[in-house]
Amino acid sequence: MAVESAAVGVFDSGVGGLSVLREIRARLPSESLLYVADNAHVPYGEKSAEYIRERCERIGDFLLEQGAKALVLACNTATAAAAAELRERYPQVPLVAMEPAVKPAAAATRNGRVGVLATTGTLKSARFAALLDRFASDVQVFTQPCPGLVERIEAGDLYGPQTRALLERLLAPILEQGCDTLILGCTHYPFVKPLLAELIPAEMAVIDTGAAVARQLERVLSARALLASGQAATPRFWTSALPEEMERILPILWGSPESVGKLVV
């Protein structure tokens, strides 16, 4: 039986989920946090659904072994591939997952034209198609797969010339269509918001789902009487790649240096 003082386990294909972790920390400062970055297998966006499901199951098992009281799947691609299976596998804990912010974007657009930046895996998924059918039938949606962008962010290059050139190329079709609203459909992408702001019209709305996930986590923990109170424990981090590489980038993306454990699953 999970207890209030147990930690929340958060995982992603890499460091992108840190954007969600920051939102959770801001909204729920009493919650102790566990974070797994599957950097040895990043990006998930070009991999098969079966491969992604296997990785998610291994990481989910690991986080539950660490005593997690809830899981947050901080990856749009993994949500599309594995969320339903993970909920069946872990009925004993709440699982909060990600999906592109199609509903709020459809409500926000003024001219009925919405652009989406996401991974190939997310854009090709049945889950994304269902979101469009359900919430975006009255708007035009222009999707743009973003190969290479996750890798730039994983390298900590949030503002350099290579990342700028890549974003300019990826944004061009969306800007040509006159979209007034942009969905960031990958948890890595909020880290390049400052650069995006230089490349898009000032009036263009940019929507991601990190804050919404933190709110949903608060709701599900409250419903199960699992909200923590008091002082949170120091967050714990693991990576399936080189710990020293993640330790190098954590001050940039998380805001403070942390020690990182090696995940072998």
UniProtKB/Swiss-Prot annotation:
Q: Indicate which residues the UniProt annotation says bind substrate.
A: 12-13, 44-45, 76-77, 187-188
EC number(s) per entry? 5.1.1.3
> Per UniProt, what is one GO molecular function of this protein?
glutamate racemase activity
Which pathway does it serve? Cell wall biogenesis; peptidoglycan biosynthesis
User: InterPro entries from the xrefs?
Assistant: Asp/Glu/hydantoin_racemase, Asp/Glu_race, Asp/Glu_racemase_AS_1, Asp/Glu_racemase_AS_2, Glu_race
Q: Which UniProt keywords apply?
A: Cell shape, Cell wall biogenesis/degradation, Isomerase, Peptidoglycan synthesis
Its recorded reaction(s) are:
L-glutamate = D-glutamate
Give the Pfam families listed for this entry.
Asp_Glu_race (PF01177)
Q: Which GO terms describe its biological process?
A: cell wall organization; peptidoglycan biosynthetic process; regulation of cell shape
Catalytic residues per the record?
75 (proton donor/acceptor), 186 (proton donor/acceptor)
Top class in the EC scheme:
isomerase
Q: What top-level branch of life does the organism fall under?
A: Bacteria
User: What function does the entry list?
Assistant: Provides the (R)-glutamate required for cell wall biosynthesis.
Please state which protein family the record places this protein in. Answer: Belongs to the aspartate/glutamate racemases family.
**Protein name in UniProt:** Glutamate racemase
What organism does the UniProt record list as the source?
Pseudomonas aeruginosa (strain ATCC 15692 / DSM 22644 / CIP 104116 / JCM 14847 / LMG 12228 / 1C / PRS 101 / PAO1)
The opening ranks of the lineage are: Bacteria, Pseudomonadati, Pseudomonadota, Gammaproteobacteria, Pseudomonadales
Q: Which gene encodes it?
A: murI
